[in-house]
């Protein structure tokens, strides 16, 4: 067949300098490019749906394979056998979960209609070594009242507006337009884990991590959730919370117009 192959991938980002190939460190894309070359016999580009930062994880990352410098790939390997074949050439912290043929003009990043991220806060009194590099450890207990404030604050993120206040200062972004449409934002607690989930048509640089840091500030009483809508409109990054560590961030789901 001919076209592109869309991969569904999961990875632990701890050992990598983000997704996209760069000269100063090993990235997830570099490992996938190597695996694709080993499988398909020539240089390939494995273009991702997002440029995740160093240390960020993914449960449902999407990337499309084509021969380097082209928009096509040709192979007789059945799509249901590609995941296992790719995984034979990948390290244990990266796994191809599924593969599907898509049209040659499909773009895994620009065809996205929504993404969902999850941020994990471990709220145990003592650190858990099994959560090392998998969650942000905040040992100060979050009361039920503080959790309710976090939930009220998360609701303030929902809507279509300029989110400059939640973008990294000085970020070299592709789009000067900071308007994004957040369709869902929730906070839940399960045992010692506080889970923040957010879905939008796109995200600014460090936006989810700044949201998580802002929610932590709300829990600590440093930001009143009633003030948050005005702070977002004000657009001043300095009035929001810290940028939460990358280790707690997971790309949870990527949505396309088609069921891919």
Where are these regions (language model features)?
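Structured-RNA-binding interfaces characteristic of tRNA pseudouridine synthases
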Residues: 1-260
């Amino acid at each position: 067949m001919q076209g592109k192959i869309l991969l569904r991938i999961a990875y632990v980002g701890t050992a990598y300098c983000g997704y996209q190939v760069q000269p100063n460190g090993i990235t997830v894309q570099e490992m996938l490019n190597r695996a694709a070359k080993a499988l398909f016999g020539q240089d390939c580009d494995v273009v991702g749906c997002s440029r995740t930062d160093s240390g960020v994880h993914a449960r449902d990352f999407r990337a499309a394979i084509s021969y380097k410098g082209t928009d096509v790939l040709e192979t007789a390997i059945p799509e249901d056998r590609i995941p296992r074949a790719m995984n034979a050439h990948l390290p244990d912290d990266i796994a191809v979960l599924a593969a599907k043929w898509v049209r040659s003009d499909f773009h895994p990043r620009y065809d996205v209609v929504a993404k969902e991220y999850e941020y994990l806060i471990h709220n145990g009194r003592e650190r858990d070594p099994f959560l090392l590099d998998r969650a942000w450890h905040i040992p100060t207990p979050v009361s039920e009242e503080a959790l309710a404030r976090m939930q009220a604050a998360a609701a303030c993120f929902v809507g279509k507006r300029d989110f400059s206040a939640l973008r990294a200062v000085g970020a070299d972004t592709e789009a000067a337009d900071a308007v994004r449409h957040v369709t869902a934002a929730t906070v839940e607690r399960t045992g010692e884990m506080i889970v923040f989930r957010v879905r939008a048509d796109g995200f600014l640089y460090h936006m989810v991590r700044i949201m998580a840091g802002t929610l932590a500030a709300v829990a600590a009483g440093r930001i009143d959730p009633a003030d948050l809508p005005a702070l977002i409109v004000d657009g001043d990054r300095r009035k929001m919370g810290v940028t939460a560590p990358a280790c707690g961030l997971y790309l949870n789901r990527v949505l396309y117009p088609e069921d891919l």
